[in-house]
């Protein structure tokens, strides 16, 4: 897995060189890795089992002067791929790490993907505002990287777990692994910011997984 970590580090350097670090959050399993590697959560140990990295674009219209992340990625040896069906951009490291870009749906949210001022087209999904509204910075490999606060990370995974299909068990394991390290007051603040439907889904998850969340 150390090789995969090196590939992830290469991608972060692309973000840094392209001026994009402050405009994105690392989400998904690699956020868990950063919680541990950057020492953001004392005593926490993650388990990375994915070849993919998910990157949440905070605001598709920022910065005002558009950047070109794909051009920088190409210079670092990444393959830039455009999905013919979804029209989304994917970066592929020569050693296999795949990077996908996400964007929160707003309003009716009819578009499956949207362009961004970072030079990539991102897949649009609901409930990502739970993450984007709760960022925290970590210092890693000399770079300032944004991730969601762990409480928001866990809350969002609870809200969407029923939609995750085959990945729901893996996500439940990640939640259980993080839960002992969660600040319950901060978690309640995040919970109080959710919509009524999101709160119902979170509460339902907690009832169904009560034994896993016992502290």
Describe the residue ranges of each PLM region.
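Compositionally biased terminal segments of proteins
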Residues: 1-215
């Amino acid at each position: 897995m150390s090789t995969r970590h090196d590939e992830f580090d290469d991608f972060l350097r692309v973000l840094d060189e392209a001026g994009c670090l402050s405009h994105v959050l690392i989400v998904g399993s690699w956020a868990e890795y950063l919680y541990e590697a950057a020492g953001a959560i004392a005593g926490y140990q993650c388990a990375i089992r994915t070849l993919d990295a998910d990157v949440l674009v905070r605001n598709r219209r920022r910065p005002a002067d558009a950047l070109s992340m794909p051009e920088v990625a190409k210079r670092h040896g990444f393959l830039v791929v455009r999905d013919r069906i979804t029209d989304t951009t994917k970066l592929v490291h020569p050693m296999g790490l795949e990077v996908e870009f996400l964007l929160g749906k707003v309003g009716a949210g009819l578009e499956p993907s949207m362009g961004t001022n970072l030079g990539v087209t991102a897949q649009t999904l609901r409930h990502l505002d739970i993450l984007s509204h709760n960022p925290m910075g970590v210092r890693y490999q000399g770079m300032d990287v944004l991730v969601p606060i762990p409480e928001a990370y866990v809350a969002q995974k609870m809200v969407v777990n029923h939609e995750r299909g085959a990945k729901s068990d893996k996500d439940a394991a990640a939640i259980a692994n993080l839960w002992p390290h969660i600040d319950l007051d901060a978690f309640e603040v995040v919970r109080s910011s959710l919509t009524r439907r999101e709160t119902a889904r979170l509460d339902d998850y907690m009832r169904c997984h009560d034994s896993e969340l016992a502290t």
